[in-house]
Amino acid sequence: LEILPEAEKRNTEFPAIFDLTNVGEDGHIVQFDEPQSVFLRGTERWHTDSSFREIPCLCTLLNAVEVPEQGGNTLFADMRAAYKAIPEDLKLIVDSLKVVHSYAYSRANNPGKLEEMSQAELAKYPPTTHPLIRTHADGSRSFYMGGHASHIEGMPVDEGRNLLSELLEISTQKQFVYSHQWSPGDLVIWDNRSTLHRLEPYDIAGHRRIMRRITVKGTEIV
């Protein structure tokens, strides 16, 4: 199992089990601008878990412990279907591209301000490069990008980021997206190699939400 960078800062007996929650240790909802809440708001952006690692995770298991009455859905986008749907001339452009993924970049672009990473954290989680298009064991292909994707290798930074934004807009169109409305006790498992996901915004300062997460280590990217 993977241990999230944020989990390393929490004194828990089982660090591989990570609570994504707006409820503090004292049982009260944390303030909107507190680090715990700011971190959660970062998950409102499309992303795939741990793509900032040299070997990203395989899948994520998310269990709903407590959910708000309205909002707080998780949206999933099918990156295989999105890639399959793009024109052949666009496939020729993107097939050979490599993307630099960076934990420092995604933290810096969080909707709220997170504390700066220490030198030890920067050394532990350096930028890493992955193919923009992943090829799976069955031969299918999918986009691999999201919130940790900083820029495209060998391309001017702004130009690469514009292309990534365009591809993200294409691949998260309604026809590629499933919205899961949570009920307490739900367990959803997804393949991070071929999906993006994000939290649908909700009243994070007014309603409790406790989600328990486990992330499974992956294998080298092809």
Task: For the regions a language model picked out, list residue spans one by one.
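Fe(II)/2-oxoglutarate oxygenase catalytic core
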Residues: 1-189, 193-222
